[in-house]
Design a protein with these regions (language model features):
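A conserved mid-protein helix/loop that constitutes part of the nucleotide-sugar donor-binding site
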Residues: 32-47
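A charged, aromatic-enriched C-terminal amphipathic alpha-helix characteristic of glycosyltransferases
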Residues: 148-198
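Acidic donor-binding loop of glycosyltransferase active sites
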Residues: 92-107
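Short acidic alpha-helix that forms the nucleotide-activated donor recognition element
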Residues: 84-95, 118
Length: 201
């Protein structure tokens, strides 16, 4: 068994949260910068061209001045306050791409990646360290781009990000169904099944 957090969900692409004329990238959650620092990704994003793309960062940050300095210099970056879980899930469902700022602690797996994957959306994840804990899950996920910040290949990472966003990869229904098999050990029902088995023995 593994973290029982993968729950496939229904996707709603009609958004009351974002401008539907733009490609919307979303990070949602807390940002304790001593654990996950968004600066590298923000620098990459600012190198993308075009006004048809937006980066939405929703949630609290221990270094708000860092976020606002980027949003002031690049008007495509939007900073929002924390929202409740129901609203967060609706925003995830409405976004085009989901952003994960990886942890610099090998023992802390960001639980949000399972919610991200459960919607079958393309995910862009930044790994500040080689053994960033979410990478082992995202490497199996067919719509993921893992940016290896620790290698500091800025030019290559900009190009990878640009190509990934321009391709806008999507899962068809059969591919989405395969995620149930791929991440079965991360589903609550697998966890419950084992508990029932142990109780009934």
């Amino acid at each position: 068994l593994d973290l029982p957090l993968f729950i496939p969900r229904i996707v709603n692409n009609d958004s009351n949260f974002f401008n539907n004329d733009k490609i919307n990238l979303l990070y949602i959650g807390t940002i304790p910068v001593h654990i996950r620092n968004p600066e590298y990704f923000l620098k990459l994003f600012c190198e993308l061209s075009g006004d048809d793309i937006a980066l939405n960062i929703i949630g609290s940050c221990t270094a708000p001045d860092l976020l606002y300095s980027f949003s002031e210099s690049d008007k495509r970056i939007h900073i929002g306050k924390s929202v409740n879980h129901k609203t967060a899930l609706s925003m995830i469902s409405s976004a085009d791409f989901l952003i994960n700022f990886g942890n610099n602690n090998t023992h802390m797996t960001p639980c949000k990646i399972f919610e991200y994957m459960s919607y079958g959306k393309p995910i862009i994840s930044v790994s500040p360290i080689k053994d960033e804990p979410s990478s082992r899950y995202l490497e199996k996920y067919p719509l993921s781009l893992i940016i290896k910040e620790y290698e500091n290949n800025v030019a290559d990472d900009i190009e990878k990000l640009k190509n990934f966003v321009s391709q806008a990869p999507k899962l068809d229904q059969s591919e989405f169904d395969k995620l149930n098999e791929l991440f079965y050990l991360n589903k609550p029902e697998a966890f419950i099944k084992v508990i029932k088995k142990e109780v009934l023995q």
